[in-house]
From Swiss-Prot:
The keyword Glycosyltransferase does not apply. It comes from the Bacteria. It is an enzyme of class 2 (transferase). GO terms for biological process: DNA-templated transcription. It comes from Pelotomaculum thermopropionicum (strain DSM 13744 / JCM 10971 / SI). This is DNA-directed RNA polymerase subunit omega. One of its GO terms (molecular function) is DNA-directed RNA polymerase activity. The lineage of its organism: Bacteria, Bacillati, Bacillota, Clostridia, Eubacteriales. Belongs to the RNA polymerase subunit omega family.
């Protein structure tokens, strides 16, 4: 799968701002854990890996009063 399109990603979240926050938080998690492979693929940048996971419904989010979890 190539990089997911913005339209495809926006179907998974409620707004583009949510998409940015969720992708950034997941990319930070991947960086801290040193995991930037998606399904055994070659090493990729953390943000790209995060966006791929969002497109594949592997990452979810929960909106709270204090932000997005």
């Amino acid at each position: 799968m190539n990089q997911p399109s913005l339209d495809e990603l926006l179907e998974k979240v409620d707004s583009r701002y949510t998409l940015v926050v969720v992708a950034a938080k997941r990319a930070r998690e991947l960086t801290e854990r040193g995991k930037t492979k998606a399904d055994g693929a070659a090493v990729m940048k953390p943000v790209t890996a995060a966006l791929m996971e969002i497109a594949q419904n592997k990452v979810g989010y929960k909106r709270t009063r204090s932000g997005i979890k």
